[in-house]
Amino acid sequence: MEQDKPFNHRPSSSAREARLVAASADEAMVGLGLRMHRFAPGDCLGDVPRLRREVYFHERGQFGDRSKRVTDGLDACGTTLAVEKGTQAIATLRLHDFAPLAVQVEYGSLFQIDAFARSWPLAQVAVGTRFAVQADQRSKPVVDRLMEEAYRWAQESRIQFCLLACEPFLHDVFEHYGFREYLPPAILPGGVDLLRMVLVIEDEPFLSECGSPLHRLIRDPARALPAKAWLTRSFNALS
């Protein structure tokens, strides 16, 4: 606790509002027969590998050694989110910060993480991967809940930037939540484009402008100001 600030046992209005929003979202999930599951690093992922396999391979008609391709070593050090219906996972996203060397090795070049490392602790820069939503569950309430839980994880972890890479057909989905491209697309072998996008946590003006469902979760808009200014200078990404 900072010594020059008196202790206030009453939670701030923004914190109280965030808890009320979370409770409301939880009630809505229950009404839909859904629940949110956060798998901590090292936890068994339950039904998540099946969902990944279904989306990544069955939908695309790709088969082969699926067991190795739907899980990897980074599952053990990441936080995996899942929206569940009954015993089935219907939407999932994996989250890491960039402090672990394995995450830097796997994703650092793609996201130009060295530029972030010169100005920010890598524990404040996160990446979202392994996004998958079951085909018959691709509705706004399901994806909203997944992204809201990811945002809460970022707030709890004191993340400043959340990065992700997606194919162009998902651009509008992530833009709706407040992500923007900050680098030109990466071209993968085979000519596949990957859009490199960033969400500045607590960026109140932009989340309001784009109508992001995450706007109501903002607790401390001032935290975004230096992060947004730095990103603009470093990548000419934001206006």
Please report, for each region that a protein language model flagged, where it lies by residue.
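Short acidic N-proximal helix/loop "leader" segments that mark the beginning
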Residues: 1-31
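Acyltransferase donor/substrate-recognition loop-hinge adjacent to the catalytic core
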Residues: 16-24, 116-119, 203-209
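Short amphipathic alpha-helix that is part of the acyltransferase structural core
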Residues: 21-75, 79-84, 89
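Sequence-level motif detector for i,i+2 pairs with an aromatic at +2
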Residues: 31-34, 78, 90, 123, ...
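Conserved GNAT-family N-acetyltransferase fold
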Residues: 81, 93, 131
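Short, His- and charge-rich active-site/binding loops that engage polyanionic ligands
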Residues: 85-117
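Acyl-donor binding region in acyl/amide transferases
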Residues: 106-200, 205
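Acidic/histidine-enriched, glycine/proline-rich intrinsically disordered or flexible terminal extensions
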Residues: 205-239
